[in-house]
């Protein structure tokens, strides 16, 4: 917490990686809440902090529809059999969702709002194919999240703007070559 006007420090005290698998592989039928719950339970068991003393669970997840809908962060926590007094929130910043979850957790600690926060993420591409959320509104009369918005159409038109299209538009605007991008990626890829 804040002490005499000083900002609190935030520390990552542990990290557990969710299992990864191939599309339609051995993990394809495992619910995302169980995958996330597995690591949350393991994390709590590795530390001497009662599960009801965690103040929040912040998880990143994109395409939060179907089995990943309904605040998957809290669902993972509860699926792990952990305390039902701990809230959770799910962050969708697309491919940066889990990273953003870590930032939000750190900000909560550094602001003095919380002391113990769990951050991470879960995604199951076998249960929710990439871009499925883009078209989930079609049965309700919405082609995709953008083209029904007058403001969006006025600004960008009706063309689809995916991450891939956006990357190309950014590269063109700022004259970034593929070689420059790959050199940058080699510095940040872990």
What are the functions of these language-model segments?
Residues 3-33, 42, 172:
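Condensing-enzyme catalytic core mediating Claisen C-C bond formation in acyl metabolism
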Residues 21-22, 26-27, 57-60, 86-101, ...:
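Cysteine-centered functional microenvironments
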Residues 36, 40-43, 47-49, 60, ...:
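N-terminal cofactor/phosphate-binding cores enriched in small/glycine residues
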Residues 42-53, 170-175:
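Phosphate/pyrophosphate-binding loops at sites that engage ATP/ADP/AMP, CoA/4′-phosphopantetheine
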Residues 61-115, 157-163:
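Conserved catalytic cysteine-centered active-site region
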Residues 110, 116-169, 173:
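Flexible glycine-/small-residue-enriched beta->alpha junction loops
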Residues 188-190:
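Conserved small/polar residues in nucleotide/adenosyl-binding loops
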């Amino acid at each position: 917490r804040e002490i005499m006007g000083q900002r609190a420090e935030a520390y990552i005290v542990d990290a557990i990686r969710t299992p990864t698998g191939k599309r339609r592989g051995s993990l394809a039928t495992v619910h995302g809440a169980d995958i996330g719950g597995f690591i949350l339970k393991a994390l709590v068991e590795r530390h001497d902090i009662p599960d009801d003393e965690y103040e929040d669970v912040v998880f990143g997840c994109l395409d939060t529809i179907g089995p990943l809908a309904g605040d998957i962060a809290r669902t993972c926590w509860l699926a792990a059999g952990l305390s039902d007094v701990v809230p959770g929130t799910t962050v969708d910043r697309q491919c940066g969702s889990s990273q953003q979850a870590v930032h939000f957790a750190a900000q909560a600690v550094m602001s003095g709002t919380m002391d113990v926060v769990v951050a991470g993420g879960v995604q199951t591409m076998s249960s929710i194919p990439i871009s499925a959320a883009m078209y989930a509104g079609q049965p309700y009369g919405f082609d995709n999240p953008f083209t029904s918005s007058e403001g969006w159409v006025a600004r960008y038109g009706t063309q689809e703007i995916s991450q891939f299209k956006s990357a190309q538009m950014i590269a063109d605007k700022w004259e970034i070559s593929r070689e420059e991008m790959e050199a940058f990626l080699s510095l940040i890829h872990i």
